[in-house]
Amino acid sequence: MTLIDFFSKDQFAASAGVRLTCVREGYAEAEMLIGPQVLNASGCVQGGALFTLADLAFAAAVNTHGPLTVSVNSHIAFFSSAREGTLHATARELVDHRRLPYGEVRITDDEGRLIALFTSSGYRKSNATIEVDSLM
């Protein structure tokens, strides 16, 4: 099983149309095709959908080392709205601390316009690991 296979079991992210496209050590990419299920009442992508996209990308990036890592604190800033196309999330682990990693996720649209910026701290659990054969 790959790390992408492991995270494909995230039913909430899957229901929002989020999927991982690339994972390597401390880095991940995910995308979300904008559909009616992620639009708010004004026809823009709902903030929770953007958070879900970023959260999955962050989770993949910080879980490339073995120990199960969970988010403990996250922040998202919204810069532009999106209504159609595909959203792209690029996650980078900025601090690879043995217990408290920190990362950033940039969400852009098909034209490369910055839609949102997500930052998060994680906690590496000492009693749980993710058993995978490879990242991709």
Segments predicted by a language model, with ranges:
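Terminal targeting signals and extreme-terminal segments of soluble enzymes
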Residues: M1-M136
